[in-house]
Amino acid sequence: MELPANVQNQLMQFQQLQQQLQMIMYQKQQFETQLKEMEKAIEEMEKSDSEEVFKMAGGILVKRNKAEVKEELSEKIETLQLRVTTFEKQEEKMQKRYTELQESLQKVMGQGQ
């Protein structure tokens, strides 16, 4: 059975959207992992009584002021939180469109039988 052009187009959109959604979810997960690592680093630094910590820079450890490193990490955390929020919004919109396309395709395929 040959599918009408509009149904083929919807199927193609559905597959593309599925791939985009997977990519968004993957990227969001990557940012969430980085976020947790940085939050854990701040938590561990706060346990230390030392005013200096070591920070990885280009494959070497460099001694740095704890307050400066904490401030840098806090800024990075803020940026990552914004990115995660942005990805969550994109994911939500795509998920809605994905569901709409899926329902539309199911209707069309159901009528064709």
UniProtKB/Swiss-Prot annotation:
> Does the keyword Secreted feature in the UniProt annotation?
no
Q: Which GO terms describe its cellular component?
A: cytoplasm; prefoldin complex
Could you tell me which InterPro entries the record lists for this protein? PFD_beta-like (IPR002777), PfdB (IPR012713), Prefoldin (IPR009053)
Q: Which CDD domains match?
A: Prefoldin_beta_GimC
- Name the source organism: Methanococcus maripaludis (strain DSM 14266 / JCM 13030 / NBRC 101832 / S2 / LL)
Q: Which family does it belong to?
A: Belongs to the prefoldin subunit beta family.
Record note on quaternary structure: Heterohexamer of two alpha and four beta subunits.
List keywords of the entry alphabetically. Chaperone, Cytoplasm
Q: Which gene encodes it?
A: pfdB
Q: Name one GO molecular function term.
A: unfolded protein binding
Give the lineage.
Archaea, Methanobacteriati, Methanobacteriota, Methanomada group, Methanococci
**Protein name, per record:** Prefoldin subunit beta
| A Pfam family hit | Prefoldin_2
Protein location: Cytoplasm
GO BP terms in the entry? chaperone-mediated protein complex assembly; protein folding
What does the protein in this record do?
A: Molecular chaperone capable of stabilizing a range of proteins. Seems to fulfill an ATP-independent, HSP70-like function in archaeal de novo protein folding.
